């Protein structure tokens, strides 16, 4: 916000906010109006002057009560050359502070990226913005910023060093167990290609680590283990059998790897598990869950089926639940974890999320020397009875 105020000799508050909206949901002056933030910026930047005069608050912040700006999304004209100057300055201060936070150990790259999105309203984390525009453009912006605003921190490491981290998955060692936490709460911990690649990377790195006896996979927060897979790629593959089959294989890399692992993996369901998220969970060697969690394969509502194991694995692992699985897959029927426990699908239920990881680690110890594997023999699946008049809501099909 202070840097935005320093641009008022070049542009209006509304123009600056409009340029900022490429990266944030609300521009700096709009936010200052909402929070009565001018005195806050003056006080905080005055304190920061202990680190250098470059942090001095813009004088205009002491002279204005409210800013003449627009609501986010309004059509505001900004000439291209002016847009570039504003953009460079705003990204310059963002990148400078991001490098400084990482270099001084104030926060991890993952926490920085995550916090900017969930707490500060960024569309993408600053390190994702850097990745999108590329190393050459980041270097150009930082060189320009150093010339315009000397004194602010510059990067001390290579571009690749700042990009080498897991964006969506937390990895913690707890009593010789690797706890993997899916952290995309803004998307209900939905899976995408990067999430599955990060899970696989952690597992592969620790598979031969003698200090790690097994893995627990859980979700961040209490709302969802994982609400499924991002479906953004699905439309472009509709009707293309070859591309669809290959994408299903690619999405199943984690599951296929777990099938052959010598160390056990326990899914700790902290909340909703749907679609691709449930397919990851059922491929783990055991499941524990909170009592109020819901499991569902909603794919049929999109005109597709669970394509990375959901149509096969449940029947092979828990044949006694075949009739229930028919309803889940063909009708999209949600079930509670108590229903899953009744058929042996969930091995242990706990009352609260606080008890979940301890239960998962106990379950890991229980199966450690005899990891359950997916049966390969033929299983009997009861016939699915199609209703006489299939309905989609009130619409007869």
Please state what every model-predicted region is:
Residues 19, 268-269, 298:
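Structural motif
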Residues 274-328, 359-361:
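CoA-thioester-processing core
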């Amino acid at each position: 916000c202070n840097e935005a105020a320093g641009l008022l000799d070049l542009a209006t508050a509304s123009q600056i906010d409009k340029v900022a909206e490429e990266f944030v949901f609300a521009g700096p002056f709009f936010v200052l109006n909402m929070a009565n933030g001018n005195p806050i910026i003056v006080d905080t930047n005055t304190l920061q002057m202990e680190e250098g005069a470059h942090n001095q608050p813009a004088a205009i912040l002491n002279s204005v009560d409210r800013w003449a700006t627009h609501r986010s999304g309004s059509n505001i004209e900004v000439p291209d050359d002016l847009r570039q100057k504003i953009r460079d300055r705003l990204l310059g201060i963002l990148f400078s502070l991001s490098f400084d936070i990482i270099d001084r150990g104030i926060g991890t790259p993952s926490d920085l990226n995550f916090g900017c999105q969930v707490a500060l309203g960024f569309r993408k984390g600053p390190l994702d913005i850097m990745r999108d525009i590329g190393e050459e453009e980041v270097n150009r912006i930082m060189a320009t910023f150093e010339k315009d605003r000397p004194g602010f921190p510059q990067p001390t490491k290579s571009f690749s060093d700042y990009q080498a981290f897991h964006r969506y998955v937390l990895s913690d060692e707890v009593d010789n167990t690797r706890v993997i936490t899916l952290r995309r709460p803004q998307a209900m911990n939905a899976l995408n290609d990067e999430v599955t690649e990060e899970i696989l990377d952690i597992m592969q790195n620790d598979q031969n680590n003698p200090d790690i006896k097994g893995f627990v996979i859980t979700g961040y927060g209490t709302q969802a283990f994982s609400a499924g897979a991002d479906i953004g790629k699905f439309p472009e593959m509709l009707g293309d059998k070859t591309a669809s089959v290959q994408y299903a294989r690619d999405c199943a890399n984690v599951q296929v790897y777990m099938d052959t692992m010598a160390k056990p993996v326990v899914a700790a369901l902290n909340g909703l598990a749907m679609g691709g998220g449930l397919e990851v969970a059922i491929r783990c060697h055991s499941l524990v869950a909170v009592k109020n969690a819901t499991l569902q394969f909603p794919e049929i509502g999109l005109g597709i089926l669970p394509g990375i194991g959901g149509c096969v694995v449940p029947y092979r692992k828990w044949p006694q639940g075949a009739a229930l699985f028919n309803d889940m897959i063909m009708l999209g029927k949600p079930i509670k974890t108590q229903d899953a426990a009744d058929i042996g699908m969930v091995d242990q239920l706990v009352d609260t999320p606080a008890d979940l990881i301890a239960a998962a680690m106990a379950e890991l110890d229980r199966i450690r020397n005899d990891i359950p594997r997916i049966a390969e023999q033929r299983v009997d699946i009861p016939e699915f009875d199609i209703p006489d008049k299939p309905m989609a809501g009130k619409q007869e099909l």
